[in-house]
């Protein structure tokens, strides 16, 4: 029986490249001249620091633009609240990976409500979908892409 997995992953190499490009752009921008501002990647978290709250917003927009250029979906960004220490502002941006159980249940419910002839099962941080026909699986992929679930999904491990 044909099957595929629904996962939510980001390419860490592309994430690192986007952070490096964002730092490079900060060094050349006129409005960030003589300002202490930087991006730092620690595992799946980008630590953003600047001298003002307004600059943090600009830096998030810079990062979002470079993520789009590198092919990383910005919907996986989860910006935490900004904190002020002294004259500097800091903010952590966490990149979500894996499908949490409530989101997996939403996906399974979405598939069942679409009345497609497929079965969906939650397996850890991914959802496996099996069906008798490849066309049913492709309709399932189209239905999930059409739904706005607030998280980017990839479809891999397609077996026939």
UniProtKB/Swiss-Prot annotation:
Nucleotide-binding protein. NCBIfam families: PRK05412.1 (NF003819). Keywords: Nucleotide-binding. This is Nucleotide-binding protein VV1_2655. Belongs to the YajQ family. It comes from Vibrio vulnificus (strain CMCP6). GO terms for molecular function: nucleotide binding. InterPro entries: DUF520, UPF0234-like_C, UPF0234_N, YajQ-like_sf. GO terms for cellular component: cytosol. Pfam families: DUF520.
């Amino acid at each position: 029986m044909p099957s595929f997995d629904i996962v939510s992953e980001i390419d860490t190499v592309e994430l690192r490249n986007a952070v490096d490009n964002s730092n490079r752009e900060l060094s050349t921008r006129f409005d960030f001249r003589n300002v202490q501002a930087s991006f730092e990647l620690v595992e799946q978290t980008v630590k953003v620091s600047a001298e003002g709250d307004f600059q943090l917003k600009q830096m998030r927009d810079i990062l979002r633009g470079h993520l789009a250029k590198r092919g990383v979906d910005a919907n996986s960004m989860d910006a935490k609240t900004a904190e002020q220490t002294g004259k500097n502002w800091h903010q952590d941006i966490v990149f979500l990976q894996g499908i949490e159980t409530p989101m997996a249940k939403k996906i399974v419910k979405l598939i069942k409500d679409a009345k497609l002839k497929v079965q969906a099962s939650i397996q850890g941080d991914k959802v496996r979908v099996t069906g008798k026909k490849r066309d049913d699986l492709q309709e399932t992929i189209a239905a999930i892409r059409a739904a706005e679930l607030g998280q980017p999904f990839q479809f891999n491990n397609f077996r026939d």
